Every structure is written in structure tokens, then in C-alpha cells.
Amino acid sequence: MFRVGLFLATNLAILLLLGLVMSLLGLDSRSASGLLLMAGCFGMGGSLISLALSKWIAKKATGAHVIEQPRNGTEEWLLHTVARQAQTAGIGMPEVAVYEADDMNAFATGMRRDAALVAVSTGLIRGMSQDEVEAVLAHEMSHIANGDMVTLSLIQGVLNTFVIFLSRMAANVIDNFLSSDEDGGGLGFFGYMAVSMLLEFVFGLFASMIVMWFSRRREFRADYGATELASKQKMIAALARLQQQHISSSLPEQVAAFGIRPRQGGLAELFRSHPSLEDRIAALEAI
């Protein structure tokens, strides 16, 4: 309920701010209001639809097998561990799935805390000790308990709305400026679309940096939550184990942001969804 209230308050503040800016710039409030409504429908609507379909997309993209009846002792242990952590975290039991992949990875997704999905790769099960797998599960359960998927989707939706609205408004300003010169031709339909799409791409890059910054913050928070559901030592051991492998994530792009990502360099660091393993271990050791 708090998250929904915060979301509504945020959008109200955005509407008031944009209304003030439009008044100061002397823009037509009626056309701007219609554009803002369209941007909100596409920006926020697209983000929420993606969230609603996230479990289905994740299962299809990874070929994950949801454990309903355990086929072996490992699957039985996974269900038991997740059930215990869910009870400790005060959330509903999520679906637990395993997907085929050589790399050690895991992710959590879902629209509601009480109806989420936790999936681990076969590579993670083979490559980690039971204590380390328990810590990884605790990390993913912390994401669910913290409502990270919903929070990031709301942030993405607000930024999507900004990107669509500002790119169209900037294209309108350019078109009006060109229409007022001696030729008076303006951009034309295709020119307007090309400029707005280019601006959307540029603004979208900056929006992605903001989303990824929030994502990195949520990773530290989930690591901290894992220390309460498992232990600090187990979480550090799991991250140290990941350092020993050359991480090359096989997760499909649709769910890559939810899993463990290889380290990149330069400007690519701004687009990372996860902090470096070194930074995460250092943060845990400082607790």
C-alpha cells in the first residue's frame, strides 16, 4: 500500500512539475496534456504489462522446470529451504524452478510478493555447496520480500513516461522553430518521427543509467537481507565462489537484469544491473 501511495504521489508531483514547465515555456497545455496522457499510457502501461508477464516470460525464455513434486533429494531440499526462508521473511511461498545452464546463476521475478518465482541454474546447483546455494536463495528471497521487481518497474514506468513525453515535446519545439523561419517547412512527418525517435534513444540511455543505479542499490540491500535469512558467512562464501569462475551469463536478455552479470569496464559500468562481486563482498564484510 505504501508503494502504491508513493507511486501516485510521485506521478502527481511529475504532473505538477511538467505543468509548471509548460506554462513557463508558453507551450499549448491542451496538446501537451494529451501528449503526457499518451506517454503515461505507453510508458507506464508497458512497464506494468512487462511486470505482469514476467513470470511467464522468464519460464519460457529459460525453459525453467517448476518443481511441483520433487524428483530427487536436491529438488526436495530446494523446496524446503525456500519454504523456510519465505516463512522467515513473512511472504507467500514462491514457485521454485530449475533451468539448464552451465553458468552459476539465479533470479527472482513476479508481480506480487506472495506469488513470485525463484529459479536457479543447474550450473549453480553443481558448482556451489549447499550453504552457498542457500545464501543465493536467501538473496533472491530478499528481492521478493523487498518488492524490488515492483519498485524497479514503477521507476522504469515513470522514466519511460518522461522519455516519451520529453522526446516528443523537444521534437515539437524543433518543428515549430523550423516552421517559423523563412522557408516555413518544418520537419515534416518523417523528419518529426526521425528526430523524436533519435531523442527517445538518447533520453532512454540516460533513463537506463538511472534504473541501473537503483538496481545496483537493491543488490546491496538483498545481500544484507540474505545475511538474515541465511548468514553473513554463507553469503560471502557464495559471492567468493562466483569470483572463482569466469562469469558469462547465459540468461536470455528478457530476464538478464534479474540474474548475476559478468563485470564490464568503462562506460558499460553505468549500465550494469549488479555491483561488482568485490564491492558486494566488501559491503558485507563491513557489516
From Swiss-Prot:
- Output the superkingdom of the source species: Bacteria
Q: Membrane-spanning residues where? A: 4-24, 35-53, 147-167, 194-214
Q: Which GO terms describe its cellular component?
A: plasma membrane
Pfam families, per database record:
Peptidase_M48 (PF01435)
Coiled-coil regions listed in the entry? none
Active-site positions on this chain: 140
Molecular function in Gene Ontology: metalloendopeptidase activity; zinc ion binding
Keywords attached to this Swiss-Prot or TrEMBL record, sorted alphabetically, are: Cell inner membrane, Cell membrane, Hydrolase, Membrane, Metal-binding, Metalloprotease, Protease, Transmembrane, Transmembrane helix, Zinc
Topology in the lipid bilayer is annotated as: Multi-pass membrane protein
Binding-site list for Zn(2+): 139, 143, 219
From the Swiss-Prot or TrEMBL record, give the protein name.
Answer: Protease HtpX homolog
Entry's EC annotation? 3.4.24.-
Task: Recall the taxonomic lineage recorded for the source organism.
Answer: Bacteria, Pseudomonadati, Thermodesulfobacteriota, Desulfobulbia, Desulfobulbales
Disulfides per UniProt: none
